């Protein structure tokens, strides 16, 4: 007999007093379908036309890289779904400063790009129709939003929205969505902000532009329990294992809680607690000497195959194999599908 996570009254409101107190006004949401004890979703960040090669990446190369590994997993596990967090016009070359002298000068370093960046338009999705078509034909895959350029001035290069006002965030999101409109690439109304960081300006802009959910927090260290809260990367104070409403119920938050360095027992503990096992990967393993521990290479692919197989054997059909977009749809508008064609509003 399948088990469900303990029910929470729909009207419950939780207000946590932190530096993000306005963002953290929200509460639990009834998110699991009847008959499911827990859920699993998988997402990949930093998807863009230059994955593995900032100058060029042919479709044949895509089949051999991260997206090839994803396809292998999708073939092996028919219930698996994936969210590809895709950047509209990727400009990042290095995620860490390479202009080391400038990076040591206070004030000045905050006003300059501390690494070379790609010219605007180099990796614009609409300039790479073969890449867009490749994404469109992937089975059981949805597209999520992952920023406009994935860069900012200052030492924290990927954190694109960190210093922007609400108006600047709105303009950036609108330009990002306009690029998706050029391609006709459908996307789910969810954002994974580059560098995980979220601000009140960004949440206000998300609400204004029709984005319904955000995946800001990542925590791979906090022990699993029904009361555990995220306290690592990005937004702190949100639930570690349950989808949760924030911003007065206007946005849904989803925490990433498992990656390549996590033990299988962590995945099992999340399922036992009736939570959402939100597995994260990055599209590129090594960039400019920086290695992503969760880069989706063959080793990580094989580990995920082991994790998925073990969970299938232990829990069978009691797990909801879902996606961040499907959870957003269920929680924020009650429909089975909430995929937007770029340029539309829900």
Regions found by a protein language model. Name each.
Residues 2-34, 117-126, 130-136, 182-294:
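Active-site-adjacent pocket scaffolds in enzyme catalytic domains
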Residues 8-134:
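Active-site beta->alpha N-cap acidic-glycine motif
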Residues 20-25, 32, 77, 213-217, ...:
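C-terminal domain-boundary segment and adjacent tail
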Residues 43-44, 144, 280, 321:
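Generic enzyme active-site microenvironment
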Residues 45-47, 147, 283, 324:
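Active-site metal-binding loops of divalent metal-dependent hydrolases
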Residues 58-71, 121-131, 166-174, 260-264, ...:
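Well-ordered, non-membrane alpha-helical segments in soluble/globular domains
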Residues 77-83, 138-142, 185-187, 210-212, ...:
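Loop/turn elements at helix/coil->beta-strand transitions in domains of secreted/extracellular proteins
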Residues 83-199, 223, 279-291:
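Metal-dependent polysaccharide deacetylase catalytic core of the NodB/CE4 family, i.e.
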């Amino acid at each position: 007999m399948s088990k469900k996570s303990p029910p929470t009254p729909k009207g419950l409101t939780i207000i946590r007093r932190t530096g993000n107190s306005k963002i953290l006004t929200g509460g639990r949401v009834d998110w699991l379908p009847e008959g499911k004890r827990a859920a699993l979703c998988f997402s990949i960040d930093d998807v863009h036309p230059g994955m593995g090669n900032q100058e060029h990446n042919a479709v044949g190369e895509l089949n051999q890289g991260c997206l090839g590994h994803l396809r292998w997993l999708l073939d092996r596990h028919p219930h698996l779904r994936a969210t590809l967090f895709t950047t509209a016009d990727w400009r990042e070359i290095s995620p860490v400063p390479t202009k080391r002298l400038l990076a040591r000068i206070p004030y000045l370093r905050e006003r300059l790009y501390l690494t070379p960046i790609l010219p605007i338009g180099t990796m614009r999705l609409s300039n790479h129709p073969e890449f867009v078509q490749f994404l469109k034909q992937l089975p059981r895959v949805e597209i999520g939003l992952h920023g406009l350029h994935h860069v900012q001035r200052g030492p924290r290069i990927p954190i694109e929205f960190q210093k922007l006002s609400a108006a600047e965030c709105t303009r950036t999101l609108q330009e990002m969505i306009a690029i998706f409109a050029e391609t006709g690439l459908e996307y789910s109304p969810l954002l994974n902000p580059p560098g995980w960081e979220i601000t009140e300006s960004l949440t206000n802009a998300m609400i204004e532009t029709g984005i319904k959910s955000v995946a800001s927090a990542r925590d791979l260290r906090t022990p699993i329990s029904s009361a555990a809260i995220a306290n690592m990367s990005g937004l702190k104070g949100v639930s570690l294992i349950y989808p949760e409403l924030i911003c007065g119920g206007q946005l849904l938050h989803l925490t990433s809680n498992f990656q390549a360095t996590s033990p299988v027992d962590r995945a099992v503990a999340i399922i036992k607690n009736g939570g959402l096992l939100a597995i994260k990967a990055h599209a590129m393993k090594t960039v400019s000497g920086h290695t992503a521990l969760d880069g989706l290479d063959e080793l990580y692919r094989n580990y995920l195959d082991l994790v998925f197989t073990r969970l299938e054997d232990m829990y069978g059909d009691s797990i909801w194999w879902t996606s961040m977009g499907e959870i957003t749809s269920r929680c924020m508008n009650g429909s089975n599908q909430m995929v937007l064609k770029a340029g539309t509003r829900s």
